[in-house]
Amino acid sequence: MANIIPKIAIIGEGVIGCTSALQISKAIPNAKITVLHDKPFKKSCSAGPAGLFRIDYEENTEYGRASFAWFSHLYRTTKGSETGVKLVSGHIQSDNLESLKQQQRAYGDIVYNFRFLDDRERLDIFPEPSKHCIHYTAYASEGNKYVPYLKNLLLEQKIEFKQQEVTSLDAVADAGYDVIVNCAGLYGGKLAGDDDTCYPIRGVILEVDAPWHKHFNYRDFTTFTIPKEHSVVVGSTKQDNRWDLEITDEDRNDILKRYIALHPGMREPKIIKEWSALRPGRKHVRIEAQKRTSVGNSKDYMVVHHYGHGSNGFTLGWGTAIEATKLVKTALGL
């Protein structure tokens, strides 16, 4: 495209939208970028996670590697109280040895100090340990700090944020944008109009008052504790294809029962916050460029799809945004 000042719309102000906006602003400094979002950030899927670095699928390893380098940079150069990024160690337990070996293949050479615990360590540390356990040290990026930090960087660059509902990519293009970056998360497929593979993964977490708890601990990826700055995140539910967000007594009792089994010394924890969200489930992250023509004004425009990160948005977002930015540059002929 030949515009001297390209107009780019990014749909979504969660971790994927803000990361994309920051990457694009660095790569195309003369672009006029607008971030469109349909609700306040506090109601988004990015507001609650503790953001522990962990990769579910080996196909995403290199995206995670790029993100890890970014978190390392932030950790070295900027206060964690501003970025929400901190270094934390912990464990993942499972009776399924292959699932832990898959974790090793996905990110064992990215994080620090990755190793399997021996029997003495397992029995000393955990009251009822699983058969196998890994240990590693990595970065965690608290959503309620990390994403606002990214947004502040964008606002300093005069990037505009607009709260408006987006139901049509064509309508955004007809408003004058040359490239649209679809970071709509769970609704990315519906907005694209050609993807029915996205599905909700209902997640519920509790935040408890346990300042002495300094290490993360997982059991089979659904039961976990992750320390934040002023609380400990306890979770979770991972319920596919459920759209309801109300937190029930069944949710609380189930999570706390599993939590106390991991940490019997922390019975009757003081719950200081609850949070639920719908994670954007998809078999693979979609990073793809498409040329389209709007129905209304017959305008040619480009869409770059960037959604479907599941539970790994914070871990993969910086790396996938690098790839999405390359597609934006190509779409603009740069």
Curated annotation (Swiss-Prot):
What is the activity regulation comment for this entry?
Inhibited by thiolactomycin.
Q: Which cofactor does it need?
A: FAD
Q: What keywords does the record list, in alphabetical order?
A: Cytoplasm, FAD, Flavoprotein, Oxidoreductase
A biological process from GO: aspartate catabolic process
Q: What is the tissue specificity?
A: Expressed in the intestinal cells, pharyngeal muscles, and body wall muscles in adult hermaphrodites.
Q: What class of enzyme is it?
A: oxidoreductase
Asked if the keyword Oxidoreductase belongs to this entry, the reply reads yes
The UniProt annotation places FAD binding at 38-39, 46, 310, 315
Question: What are the subcellular locations of this protein?
Answer: Cytoplasm
Q: What is its EC number?
A: 1.4.3.1
How does a null allele present? Mutant worms have decreased egg-laying capacity at 20 degrees Celsius and decreased hatching rate and smaller brood size at 25 degrees Celsius. Mutant worms also exhibit decreased fertilization rates but do not show any change in physical appearance.
Catalysed reaction, written as an equation: D-aspartate + O2 + H2O = oxaloacetate + H2O2 + NH4(+); D-glutamate + O2 + H2O = H2O2 + 2-oxoglutarate + NH4(+)
Give an example GO cellular component term for this record: peroxisomal matrix
| Pfam families hit by this protein | DAO
Predominant location category:
cytoplasm
Question: Keyword Oxidoreductase: yes or no?
Answer: yes
GO MF, one annotated term: FAD binding
Regarding protein family, the annotation reads:
Belongs to the DAMOX/DASOX family.
- Primary role: Selectively catalyzes the oxidative deamination of acidic amino acids. May play a role in the egg-laying events and early development of the worm, in addition to quality control of the germ cells.
What's the name of the protein?
D-aspartate oxidase 2
Task: Please name the source species.
Answer: Caenorhabditis elegans
| Lineage of origin | Eukaryota, Metazoa, Ecdysozoa, Nematoda, Chromadorea
